[in-house]
């Protein structure tokens, strides 16, 4: 998920995330080194197919380092395995909320999302969900770079996963962190956030794909090394 956080008039969701939940969020990975990898763009097959569970943790430390290095260089707040061509159920995230850093890796995650959030929004549903704002918060995606679209998400979710040490954890997230978890979890299901947009944005999405010659395998971009 791209780092560009944009609001349209207001943000109605609370970003409360308790210290107790933070302790359950899994061990914060020790991040040093790591290679910056190509980020694949919509059209690459791995982005549009469900990822497979991680069964071998022996090389996971290096994968995690590379994913963090790539995410920070992008820059982004989340990155899933399929985005770097790895069809495994793993994502990393790093999001600062006030003075609190939410950072970790989720391996073989499950995400509990309250009922009532549509798989794809209709224009009417979006209008009904936006009575206190002009439109829902916008999202961006490193696999659909340079664009942001409004998308309604569940205001709270529960993530259960394993960290890089194969230790299980559960975290209850609200607000923007909940949005990040939903966005990255979607990647593991073979879904991009643009697949969920209201129909009225489908023309813009198609035009973006045409203009950039996306929608075919092998398209990618490589983030630049961050300057010291």
Swiss-Prot record:
Signal peptide: none annotated. Keywords: Hydrolase, Iron, Metal-binding, Protein biosynthesis. It catalyses: N-terminal N-formyl-L-methionyl-[peptide] + H2O = N-terminal L-methionyl-[peptide] + formate. Binds 1 Fe(2+) ion. Its cofactor is Fe(2+). InterPro entries: Peptide_deformylase, Peptide_deformylase_sf. Disulfide bonds: none annotated. It comes from the Bacteria. The active site is at residue 184. Its EC number is 3.5.1.88. Residues 8-18, 123-133 have a biased composition (Polar residues). Gene3D superfamilies: Peptide deformylase. It is an enzyme of class 3 (hydrolase). Residues 1-28, 116-138 are annotated as: Disordered. GO terms for molecular function: metal ion binding; peptide deformylase activity. The keyword Hydrolase applies. Fe cation binds at residues 141, 183, 187. Belongs to the polypeptide deformylase family. Removes the formyl group from the N-terminal Met of newly synthesized proteins. Requires at least a dipeptide for an efficient rate of reaction. N-terminal L-methionine is a prerequisite for activity but the enzyme has broad specificity at other positions. This is Peptide deformylase. It comes from Tropheryma whipplei (strain Twist) (Whipple's bacillus).
């Amino acid at each position: 998920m791209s780092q560009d956080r944009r609001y349209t008039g207001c943000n109605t969701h609370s970003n409360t995330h308790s210290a107790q939940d933070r302790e359950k969020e899994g061990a914060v990975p020790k991040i040093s080194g790591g290679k910056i990898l190509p980020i694949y763009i919509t059209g690459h097959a791995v982005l549009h197919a469900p990822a497979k569970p991680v069964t071998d943790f022996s090389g996971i430390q290096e994968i995690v380092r590379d994913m963090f290095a790539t995410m920070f260089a992008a820059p982004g707040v989340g990155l899933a395995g399929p985005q770097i061509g790895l069809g495994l159920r793993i994502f990393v995230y790093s999001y600062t909320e006030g003075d609190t850093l939410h950072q970790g890796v989720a391996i073989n995650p499950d995400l509990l999302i309250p009922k009532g959030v549509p798989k794809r929004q209709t224009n009417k549903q979006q209008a009904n969900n936006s009575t206190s704002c002009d439109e829902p918060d916008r999202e961006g995606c490193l696999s659909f770079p340079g664009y942001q679209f409004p998308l309604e998400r569940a205001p709270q979710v529960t993530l259960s996963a394993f960290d890089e040490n194969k230790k299980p954890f559960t975290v209850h997230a609200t607000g923007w962190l909940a949005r990040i978890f939903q966005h990255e979890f979607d990647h593991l299901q073979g879904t991009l956030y643009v697949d969920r947009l209201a129909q009225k944005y489908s023309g813009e999405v198609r035009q973006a794909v045409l203009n950039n010659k996306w929608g075919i395998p092998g398209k990618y971009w490589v983030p630049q090394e961050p300057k010291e």
